[in-house]
């Protein structure tokens, strides 16, 4: 069995080498104090049945050091979303129904929201987002000024978990970030064409010139289409990590919601990663199974060194934790038991593949969307 031990050691070592390459380029927000004696920007929040989440976001907006307008686009909510939003002083606008079925997801709400914005700068922020610091919005504006106040800036929030099951989102969140290509030196350095969806910042002129969310009207995950629309107009598209300024808590409704959410995400947004980066990601993930396989076999066969296999597993686990700490706060127990996370990720990936290629339909928040029609 020594030969198998050597093979597994080589596989895990190669896997960790890939892990060192998939997220070795950082894109972090730079803070700077700015002075505004007028509204700095308009924050547009698309919301559908968000009464349990939107209050945290609105409270964090009130704490910001720069003055902003807040518009909550109420997209057919049947709960108290509108009442909660108004209690924080936000302007609530009911989304006009899409009777023609030409729009998917939140793009319809976002596009309508821009018509109510009073400032040139506009930011689209999901209802489950929270600004962690009082200078968070100020930092976003500063970063946007550094790119000449042109194009599109987007942020992937730091993922905060509170219940054990929420940690099963770990790999998905990491893949969302590294799958954008620009966080790896394996990227060829060409113009970025993709954007994160939870937090985006732009200006009205560029928004309307590119078509804005109209370019993503048939997309459930709008970031890729939005980024491509800006790139096609030779406008810059930038992506940043959220920590320590922006965070979100996902799928707090329960484990079923988590499964449905990530199935939707993979069904519609897994095609933008470049082949060599995707290959490195797959090889890195395979190291999780290879390391636990070596550990289990060493406990059964004396020819394999238990000490060596334990060291191999711990080495991979250390890197696994290190990479995930950049994107979120997850259960230490789940991090150590990463093969469980890998198996869950595989299950959802297969499930999303079936929905995309066999059924052509994905369901989210009580609405069904045809994947086969998404362009």
Swiss-Prot record:
It is a multi-pass membrane protein. It is found in: Cell membrane. Its EC number is 2.4.1.-. Keywords: Carotenoid biosynthesis, Cell membrane, Glycosyltransferase, Membrane, Transferase, Transmembrane, Transmembrane helix. InterPro entries: Glyco_trans_2-like (IPR001173), Nucleotide-diphossugar_trans (IPR029044). Pathway: Carotenoid biosynthesis; staphyloxanthin biosynthesis; staphyloxanthin from farnesyl diphosphate: step 4/5. It comes from the Bacteria. GO terms for cellular component: plasma membrane. Pfam families: Glycos_transf_2. GO terms for biological process: carotenoid biosynthetic process. Its main location: membrane. Catalyzes the glycosylation of 4,4'-diaponeurosporenoate, i.e. the esterification of glucose at the C1'' position with the carboxyl group of 4,4'-diaponeurosporenic acid, to form glycosyl-4,4'-diaponeurosporenoate. This is a step in the biosynthesis of staphyloxanthin, an orange pigment present in most staphylococci strains. This is 4,4'-diaponeurosporenoate glycosyltransferase.
